[in-house]
C-alpha cells in the first residue's frame, strides 16, 4: 500500500491533499496489518509446532507478543516514516532513528531486568508507539503548516 502511494504523495503539491491521502493510507495499512496480526497470533501455535516442533510450544505466547509489537511498527510508524522522504523531508527520519535506537536500548535494558524476556517486547512496543506518534505529529505539521 505504502509503495503504491509513495509516488502519488511525491507528486502531490497541496499539503492538505497529501495529509488526507496519508490518513487514508494509514487507516488502510493499520486495517490490513491488524488482520494479518490476528491471523499470525491465532496461527502461532501451529506455525511453531510445524517449523520448530512441539519442543518449542512454550514460545507461543512470546510469538504472539511479537506479532502485536511488529503490528504497532507497521500500523503506526511506517506510513509517516516512509512518506516524509516523499515530501522532501528525510533528515527527520535519521534523527528519529538515532533517538529511537538509543531509547530502545535504554528501555530494553531496564525492561528485561524487570520482566525478563517479556521486557524486550514491552520496550519495543513502547518505543514503536511513542516514535509513531511523534512521526505522525511531525508529518502532519509538515503537510499542513510548512
Model-found features: residue ranges?
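Residue-level hotspots within the lipid-embedded alpha helices of multi-pass solute transporters
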Residues: 8, 33-38, 67-74, 97-101, ...
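Membrane-interface helix-loop junctions in multi-pass transport and translocation proteins
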Residues: 44-49, 99-133
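Alpha-helical transmembrane segments of multi-pass membrane transporters/permeases
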Residues: 19-29, 63, 82-106, 118-121, ...
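Helix-loop junctions and terminal segments of transmembrane helices
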Residues: 1-15, 80-86
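Multi-pass alpha-helical transporter architecture, strongest
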Residues: 128-144
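Membrane-helix interface residues
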Residues: 13, 51, 87-89, 115
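Interfacial segments at transmembrane-helix termini and the short loops linking adjacent helices
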Residues: 42-71
Amino acid at each position: 500500500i505504502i509503495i503504491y502511494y509513495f509516488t502519488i504523495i511525491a507528486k502531490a503539491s497541496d499539503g492538505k491533499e497529501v495529509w488526507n491521502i496519508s490518513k487514508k493510507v494509514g487507516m488502510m495499512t493499520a486495517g490490513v496489518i491488524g488482520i494479518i496480526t490476528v491471523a499470525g497470533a491465532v496461527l502461532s501455535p501451529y506455525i511453531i509446532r510445524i517449523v520448530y516442533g512441539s519442543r518449542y510450544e512454550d514460545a507461543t505466547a512470546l510469538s504472539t507478543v511479537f506479532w502485536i509489537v511488529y503490528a504497532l511498527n507497521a500500523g503506526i510508524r511506517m506510513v509517516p516514516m516512509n512518506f516524509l522522504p516523499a515530501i522532501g523531508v528525510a533528515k527527520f527520519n535519521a534523527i528519529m532513528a538515532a533517538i529511537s535506537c538509543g531509547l530502545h536500548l535504554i528501555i530494553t535494558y531496564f525492561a528485561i531486568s524487570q520482566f525478563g524476556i517479556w521486557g524486550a517486547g514491552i520496550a519495543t512496543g513502547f518505543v514503536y508507539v511513542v516514535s509513531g506518534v511523534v512521526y505522525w505529529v511531525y508529518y502532519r505539521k509538515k503537510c499542513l503548516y510548512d
